[in-house]
Amino acid sequence: MKKLLIIILFLFPSNSLAVEKNTTFTHEIFKKAQAENKIIVINSWNEFCLTCKKQIKILDQAKDKFKDIIFLSYEQTENKAIADILSIDYWTTIVIYKGKTEAYRSMGVTKKKDLYLAIEEVLKDKV
């Protein structure tokens, strides 16, 4: 049994599960986008979170579809100050702002249609 476990660990190294993403959130970008009344999608993630990995893949695709939207992300564990400012307590949280107003918040959503629908609903209300 011990040998089997060792073989499995070598076949599936833990870094293959890691999220490959950089923090793109900065206060300057966020405040400027708010001042310009832009729609901003913020995603909180963690390096070894599989749900986060699914969300990142969907949001990366959304960037191509929704060109006028600002997409920002940050690694939750290393950026507690950002999490505190945005009142985000958990990985997998996605928040959508319309200017300075929070228009949508979810946690753990991994269905593309649900995330796209949320973005489209905020776009419909665009002033």
Annotated model-derived regions:
Residues 86-95:
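Structural micro-motif
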Residues 44, 67-80:
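Thiol-based oxidoreductase modules, predominantly thioredoxin-like and allied folds used
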Residues 98-127:
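Non-catalytic, surface beta->alpha helical segment in thiol-disulfide oxidoreductase systems
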Residues 17-37, 121-127:
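N-terminal leader/targeting and pre-domain segments
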Residues 51-65:
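Typically the conserved alpha-helix immediately C-terminal to a functionally engaged Cys/Sec
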Residues 4-13:
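Sec-dependent N-terminal signal peptides
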Residues 35-47:
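Short active-site neighborhood of thiol/selenol oxidoreductases, capturing the structured segment around
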